[in-house]
């Protein structure tokens, strides 16, 4: 059992998500947990479970500063909050893509900066959930080297498919239809199915199982610099050591892009 004095703050803890699952898993491991979200009403079940909840809009510097000032000490920061956007590059709304980058990259770094004084004092840890956030993965490598002299560990959390509200929220908050003039018109149905992640919706690791595994990894005496958890995460890890492009056919079959390719070619 981890000492109750250890504290963790997790961003993006709305109910049904991976952040909420992490909050529960950390509490069960003996941590004092600060669960945060932009809308505190979406963390009601966590409050009922005895988990402390704080308001945090990661896109607001004022909100970040207020949240950081309300925490007296911190051992682990988990940058979990983020968003997703599925659209072929040819049809992508660049302004929307820039907003996504603000959420998934710059906001994460702003949160890390705000809580860094606490983490340096405790010689703590920063962990960033990384699915499609490739830029954050690169920044994690930089932070790991830069913060090592201060005793702060930086862990890159690479996650496969997890059964959570992420895909559901994506369908609600982001466009899932191609524009009328898309070059993918001959394969519209197949492309939009891939954008909705139809083939991936029911194959994810249960969020509570994923969270327990991640907490177990992070609380090891010497946690790995990169943690691979979630369905198909091992496949992603294997792909990093294979020749570039070797996994293309597997990824196409997993996502439905093989069907897209067939329809575009025969059009």
Curated annotation (Swiss-Prot):
It comes from Pestalotiopsis microspora. Induction: The expression of the dibenzodioxocinones biosynthesis cluster is positively regulated by the transcription factor dibT. Pfam families: adh_short. InterPro entries: NAD(P)-bd_dom_sf (IPR036291), Sc_DH/Rdtase_CS (IPR020904), SDR_fam (IPR002347). Belongs to the short-chain dehydrogenases/reductases (SDR) family. GO terms for cellular component: endoplasmic reticulum; lipid droplet. PROSITE patterns: ADH_SHORT (PS00061). This is Short-chain dehydrogenase/reductase GME11361.
């Amino acid at each position: 059992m981890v000492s109750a004095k250890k504290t963790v703050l997790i961003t993006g803890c709305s109910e049904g998500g991976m952040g909420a699952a992490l909050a529960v898993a950390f509490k069960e491991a003996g941590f004092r947990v600060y669960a945060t979200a932009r809308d505190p009403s979406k963390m009601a079940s966590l409050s009922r479970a005895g988990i402390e909840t704080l308001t945090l809009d990661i896109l607001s510097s004022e909100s970040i500063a207020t949240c950081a000032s309300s925490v007296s000490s911190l051992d682990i920061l988990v940058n979990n909050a983020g968003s997703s956007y599925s659209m072929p590059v040819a049809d992508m709304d660049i302004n929307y893509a820039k907003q996504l980058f603000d959420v998934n990259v710059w906001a994460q770094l702003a949160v890390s900066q705000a809580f860094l004084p606490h983490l340096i004092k405790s010689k703590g840890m920063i962990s960033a959930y990384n699915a499609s956030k490739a830029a954050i993965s690169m920044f994690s490598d930089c932070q790991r080297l830069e913060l090592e002299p201060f005793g702060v560990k930086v862990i890159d959390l690479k996650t496969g498919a997890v059964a959570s509200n992420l895909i559901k929220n994506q369908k609600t908050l982001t466009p899932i239809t191609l524009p009328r003039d898309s070059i993918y018109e001959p394969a519209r149905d197949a492309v939009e199915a891939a954008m909705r992640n139809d083939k991936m919706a029911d194959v994810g690791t249960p969020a509570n199982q994923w969270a327990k595994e991640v907490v177990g990894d992070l609380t090891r005496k010497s946690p790995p610099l990169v943690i691979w958890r979630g369905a198909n995460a091992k496949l992603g890890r294997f792909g990093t050591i294979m020749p570039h492009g070797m996994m293309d056919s597997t990824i196409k079959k997993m996502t439905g892009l093989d069907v897209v390719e067939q329809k575009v070619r025969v059009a």
